[in-house]
């Protein structure tokens, strides 16, 4: 599924590709009798749509039992696309009994890429931290974070561990944009224009949609300044994942972007 923040048509750019990709692959699986297990890359986006929902969960934290029921084609459309795609996968799975489905639901994925420069939303976030766009302050936004190499490890384990079943929320730590910036400052100091404070929510609500169309007032109200809490115990107990250091993950990604000339010292 495309992971992009800037798009022209949510239905055509996000939702249709996510659904078509899932259905096409699983159609091929149904036609290939040797396949016994499918590992699907879904997302935390299929578990929760807005951070504020965390307070309404039974245990006060997101886990594999939760489904995103609040996103739509006009509110958090990327989250909506991932939810529709995973639900479609489970429906196709239920209609047959030859192969099993195991789902990986990663939170925000960071770490170095294999392909060099990237246009993914994750890279946009790190890029804006390092190129000065957030110098005046970072939005007060919390999220789960995981190293891309841990996500790869989770897929391999999900494929070969027999007891693996169902969904798996994959993240190491909960962090904020300012928290990521502070981790990077431990190595890079003030060499790059990393933010040193958070912007007030009221200011983002007032001017955010004017400055950046990806920030709707509804999105700001339901996510900024809210606590994100998740439960990753299933991934540790059932898949045996030993999560990497978030600090090392952020540094590896940031350094790769520096080496590629994506931003420069002040």
Per-region residue spans from a language model:
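Active-site "gating" loop of Rossmann-like NAD(P)-dependent oxidoreductase/epimerase domains
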Residues: 43-74, 114, 131
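Glycine-rich Rossmann NAD(P)(H)-binding loop
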Residues: 111, 138-141, 168-175, 237-239
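NAD(P)H-binding glycine-rich loop region in Rossmannoid oxidoreductase-like domains
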Residues: 1-20
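Conserved C-terminal active-site "lid" loop/helix of NAD(P)H-dependent oxidoreductases
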Residues: 208-240
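Mid/C-terminal beta-alpha module of Rossmann-like enzyme folds, strongest
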Residues: 154-217, 246-266
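A conserved pocket-lining segment of Rossmann-fold NAD(P)-dependent short-chain dehydrogenase/reductase
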Residues: 7, 68-74, 115-116, 121-146, ...
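Glycine/proline-rich active-site loop of Rossmann-fold NAD(P)-dependent oxidoreductases
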Residues: 95-99, 111-125, 158-168
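Active-site Tyr-X1-5-Lys
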Residues: 31, 70-102
